[in-house]
Amino acid sequence: MVCTPAENFNNSLTIASKPKNEAGLAPLLLTVLELVRQLMEAQVIRRMEEDLLSEPDLERAADSLQKLEEQILHLCEMFEVDPADLNINLGEIGTLLPSSGSYYPGQPSSRPSVLELLDRLLNTGIVVDGEIDLGIAQIDLIHAKLRLVLTSKPI
């Protein structure tokens, strides 16, 4: 039986009332959104410091980042996820996100986070080359050869 989005419509409306431990992928997706939001914020700060943004561009970026943060907090409330739980502790690697106020782009930090590493890689630029095989039940179904150029600068 094929399941269409319309068949699951009522289930999706009630997901917000489920307990935290049944929130499914919501905490993970919110964590990724917050990571991307903070990466964009760091890039806006870098461009502001280098005088690469006009005043209207800076205002638009600041407004957009603020609205995105509000939406993430609203979704956290809907799914009963504590925003502090979005910062995952990765053991020896450190935390995913820096603690509030502890990181400013371009400045060294006493306890670097994964976000800081990604921000520095974006600022410097990096090329990732590799192959990915995706599958299920020990059957390779998708083969991909990738070359990814990750940078905040125009290519």
Curated annotation (Swiss-Prot):
Taxonomic superkingdom: Bacteria
One GO MF term: structural molecule activity
GO process terms (BP): gas vesicle organization
A GO cellular component entry from the record: vesicle membrane
Record key words, sorted: Gas vesicle
InterPro entries: Gas-vesicle_GvpA-like, GvpK
Role, per record: Might be involved in nucleating gas vesicle formation. Gas vesicles (GV) are hollow, gas filled proteinaceous nanostructures. During planktonic growth they allow positioning of the organism at a favorable depth for light or nutrient acquisition.
Protein's UniProt name: Gas vesicle protein K
